Amino acid sequence: MLRTFETNYLREVTELSSSLWEFSPNEGEFQGNVYPVWVPCCWENLPDFSAYRGTGSFRKEFEAEGNVRLVFKGVSHTATVLVDGKEVGSHYNAYTPFSVMLKDLEPGVHKLEVIADNRFSEKSALHVPNDYMSYGGISRGVAMEELEGAYIEYIHAVPERTEKGWNVKLAVKVVNLEDAEKIVELQVAVDGLFEITKEVNLKAGEEALVEETVDAGTPDVWEMDHPVLYTICAVLSDADGAFDDLASHLL
């Protein structure tokens, strides 16, 4: 499970973690050996690799087509991502999520390979010889999202107390994956507190940041003995109806 609550109801999301992958070390005594591992996984959990420092490949097949977004919640500490043998992305920092976009993917079964690297180097500002362990592996969840022509990349919602109640500062990023201009309708709502609708004009292959400050009235406030969470949900629509969404929690 990637989150303890549903983040999408329209967007098709498949978790690739919480399953068996193939792991192979790329150097050392056991180079080329293949081990079935349960991802998320750090190779230090494997008996032969408790002190292994180097690179290792994690492989998994997936079936998809069209616009596909691979989302990685964390890879320690540097990741190189390949699909069908071709490098499609990379990321440094074990503790931040990242994603890779695959546009117009051919229908069929594809091979995903994530090369994790826990070596110390000049490129690794944080991970230097020290008194804590720099783990190696896919340390957090992985998801595959199958997208339409546009999608919501994120929702940022910051509550602010005012003299009359609460405001919410919204920032919603919408991305156009098509090679033509696209007009969409963005609706953002929070559990009966407010609902707004905006028309968003997206240039070909570009993105737009929709920002708005909304009056949220006088909601229940989260406290230790009264832990109230609200669900904020954003939905994209076009002439054919709603086609993408993203939900999160708001204090």
Task: Kindly label every feature range from the protein language model.
Residues 111-114, 226-238:
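Short, aromatic- and glycine-rich surface loops/edge beta-strands on solvent-exposed regions
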Residues 7-8, 233-251:
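N-terminal carbohydrate-binding accessory modules
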Residues 68, 81-83, 166-202, 208-212:
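Beta-strand-rich binding/interaction modules
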